[in-house]
């Protein structure tokens, strides 16, 4: 089994898993804390519009996906601020519009879009050197941004109204974080696809949240959890010859419930010990 480690494509996959774990730990902690998971799902699915347009007009589908994810995120934010539009309705509108545009342009594109399943469901084993270089740059920038402006980001994530009373540039940081979310979603499309990418921005953070409370600790723990999820999914995909994206998500959910069970057992043991001492 360990012989698979000698293959270049698998080494690329491992490096991609590491970079995405670092990237999604930062962005996902903000997404979960700010309760933007559904909005993130809307941005991810809206990015299909850019993939379809890229195939039709002949430019990079990933570039189109990034543009649509960013516009989708800003559109969701703008609509949600309207008094006559519910936030979940805004997400549904952008979500379905982006996917519809993507389907139409993919259908109209000359020939058959053979790599469409890769964008939908992901394939971490198809990551190239150029993908890793772009993801490395994005990860380095995101880590710097989050640790340089940690106090502001945490305040905006937990209580944006309080942040405004402190004179913090809430709107500017919300826009910047929306841009980073969009780029993160696109950067992880190769791994798990449009349909599942939001899971990388939420499940490791939920697992970390079982044991930690502070934002910084959530980021650090979810880095480890996310990498373990990706490793487990990679090897499961190799052993069973099944799609890697789905395998990663299945492993992450299983580990979440395993961690939840362990926490419950430890809590009961602690409570029982305390009761006996009394």
Report the location of each language-model feature.
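Transmembrane alpha-helical segments in multi-pass inner-membrane proteins
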Residues: 191, 195-246
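Short loop segments and helix-boundary regions at transmembrane helix junctions
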Residues: 29-112, 208-220, 237-240, 264-265
